[in-house]
């Protein structure tokens, strides 16, 4: 009996050791309830609705699809991937360099505030509730402003979370946050917003698979109208959002 019990315990221990890395932290971090203040930002959608660029479900899907594939979605994912790799091996110099680049790439004051406020809030919340060996040391390398994608990549890398699902979760959360903003701006309803998320999900998957092959030299954006919209939003007469 003792032998059988011992064998069972050994088998149980082996099963736990062989289990895949839990992705539960991603499910917790990249949800609307995580305290980063994402609800306060629309990433130029508020201006796009005012200007008539976003009028309905179809135009919203097109606008967000462009932001994802040609704009900040792609660039942020590249930055998150490089922060993930640097954090995973404890390369503080590389982390600081990626973060400085990410902050500098923000095309306007409002979008810089958006990424830096969320980045610092995200990092503070993870450190407070999800400690891990090396997390505080990695965070200490980022003095002052912290870009949101860098904060996400850092936390996931330190926690040993795989890069591909981290990128998928990060990009999908980005889409969901922007769709939520669009619903509050009222050009679409909740059901239409859900369809937009489903429409963009394959693009999220494809981009998450592509990003690990890209370098910092591949950073770039072709969403000029959205970038200009972030400037115009600063003086927009009626505003619900900070960007």
Swiss-Prot record:
GO cellular component, one term: cytoplasm
Listed Pfam families: UreF (PF01730)
Alphabetical list of InterPro entries matching this protein: UreF (IPR002639), UreF_sf (IPR038277)
Broad class of the protein's primary localization: cytoplasm
Keywords, ordered alphabetically: Chaperone, Cytoplasm, Nickel insertion
Molecular function terms from GO: nickel cation binding
Subcellular locations according to the entry: Cytoplasm
Task performed by this protein: Required for maturation of urease via the functional incorporation of the urease nickel metallocenter.
PANTHER family for the chain: UREASE ACCESSORY PROTEIN F (PTHR33620:SF1)
Oligomeric form and interacting partners: UreD, UreF and UreG form a complex that acts as a GTP-hydrolysis-dependent molecular chaperone, activating the urease apoprotein by helping to assemble the nickel containing metallocenter of UreC. The UreE protein probably delivers the nickel.
Protein family per UniProt: Belongs to the UreF family.
Name used for this protein in its record: Urease accessory protein UreF
Organism of derivation: Xanthobacter autotrophicus (strain ATCC BAA-1158 / Py2)
Protein encoded by which gene: ureF
């Amino acid at each position: 009996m003792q032998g059988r019990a011992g064998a069972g315990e050994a088998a149980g221990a082996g099963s736990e050791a062989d289990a895949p890395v839990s992705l539960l932290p991603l499910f917790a971090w990249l949800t609307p309830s995580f305290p980063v203040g994402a609800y306060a930002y629309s990433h130029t959608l508020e201006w796009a609705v005012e200007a008539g660029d976003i009028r309905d479900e179809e135009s919203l899907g097109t606008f967000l699809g462009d932001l994802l594939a040609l704009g900040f979605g792609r660039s942020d994912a590249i930055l998150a991937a490089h922060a993930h790799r640097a954090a995973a091996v404890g390369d503080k110099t590389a982390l600081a360099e990626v973060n400085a680049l990410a902050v500098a790439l923000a095309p306007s004051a409002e979008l810089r505030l958006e990424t830096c406020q969320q980045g610092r809030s995200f990092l503070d919340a993870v450190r407070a509730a999800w400690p891990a060996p090396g997390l505080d040391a990695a965070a200490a390398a980022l003095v002052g402003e912290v870009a949101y994608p860098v904060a996400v990549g850092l936390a996931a890398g330190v926690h040993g979370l795989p890069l591909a699902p981290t990128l998928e979760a990060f990009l999908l959360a980005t889409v969901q946050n922007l769709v939520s903003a669009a619903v509050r701006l009222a050009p679409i309803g909740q059901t239409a917003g859900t369809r937009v998320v489903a429409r963009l999900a394959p693009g999220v998957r494809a981009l998450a698979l592509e990003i690990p092959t890209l370098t910092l030299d591949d950073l770039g954006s072709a969403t000029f109208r959205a970038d200009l919209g972030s400037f115009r939003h600063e003086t927009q007469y009626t505003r619900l959002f900070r960007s």
